[in-house]
UniProtKB/Swiss-Prot annotation:
Family assignment from sequence similarity: Belongs to the ninE family.
Taxonomic placement: Viruses, Duplodnaviria, Heunggongvirae, Uroviricota, Caudoviricetes
Protein name, per record: Protein ninE
UniProt source species: Enterobacteria phage H19B (Bacteriophage H19B)
Length: 58
């Protein structure tokens, strides 16, 4: 048995149900604590390359 195709109107109406309200979109987000913020070491890859190059010369 084949699935019935949904109409374009049905798809649009389905998407409209879940649109956030203006208030929820503009609501200020709480600032996380310093301990909750995860940092990323951007230079780690560069250090790895440098270390491997140094090791290869030895």
């Amino acid at each position: 048995m084949r699935r019935q195709r949904r109409s374009i109107t049905d798809i649009i109406c389905e998407n409209c149900k879940y649109l956030p309200t203006k208030r929820s979109r503009n609501k200020a987000k709480p600032i996380p604590k310093e301990s909750d913020v995860k940092t990323f070491n951007y230079t780690a890859h560069l250090w790895d390359i440098r270390w491997l190059r140094h090791r290869a010369r030895k």
